[in-house]
Structures are given as structure tokens and as C-alpha cells.
Amino acid sequence: MQVAYHWQVISRLLIALLRFYKLFISPLLGPRCRFAPSCSEYAMTAIGRFGPLRGSWLAARRLGRCHPFHPGGFDPVPDAPASPSSSCSCKGPHP
């Protein structure tokens, strides 16, 4: 239980840093992101949905695609994988 709490604290800290960037730094730089949602919104959603490790990895991959040679466009955060019991059509119990 304690480990999960630490990951939650790290997620909240990362999201707070992203909000700070979005409120105070991003307006100084002007609109630059070629994606929708913006890279900072994408990162906040990914960290909130997948936690700090996988969410940060997804955000880093997104930043790697954010360059002048990529067309950009709509690029949402992937959905969290469904639990095995909700995607399985069998009638038996799952371990």
C-alpha cells in the first residue's frame, strides 16, 4: 500500500510541474505544438492514466514526434488496457 502511495505522490508532483509550465512558461513561448491535445495536456493525461513511469515514457515519445518534419494532428493518449475479465468472452473464472 505504501508503494502505491509514493507513485501517486510522484504522479501529482509531475502533473503540478506540467501545470506550472502550462500556466507560466508556455504563454511566453506562444503556441508551438503541432498536436491536439497539446504535448503538456497529453503528458498530464498519460501520467494520470498510466502512472509516472509509463506516462512519462508516453510523453517522451510524444515529444520525440513533435518536430517540423512530422505532420502533427490529433494524437490522443491510448486507452488503458482492459482487464482480462472484461475482454474475455469465456464464462469461467479468471485467476
Curated annotation (Swiss-Prot):
- InterPro entries, alphabetically? Membr_insert_effic_factor_YidD (IPR002696)
User: What keywords tag this UniProt record?
Assistant: Cell inner membrane, Cell membrane, Membrane
Instruction: Give the membrane topology.
Output: Peripheral membrane protein
- List the residue ranges forming a coiled coil, or say none: none
Name one cellular component (GO) term. plasma membrane
Q: Origin, by domain of life? A: Bacteria
Q: List locations, semicolon-separated.
A: Cell inner membrane
* Reported function: Could be involved in insertion of integral membrane proteins into the membrane.
Q: Which family does it belong to?
A: Belongs to the UPF0161 family.
Q: What is this protein called?
A: Putative membrane protein insertion efficiency factor
Q: State the organism named in the record.
A: Xanthomonas oryzae pv. oryzae (strain MAFF 311018)
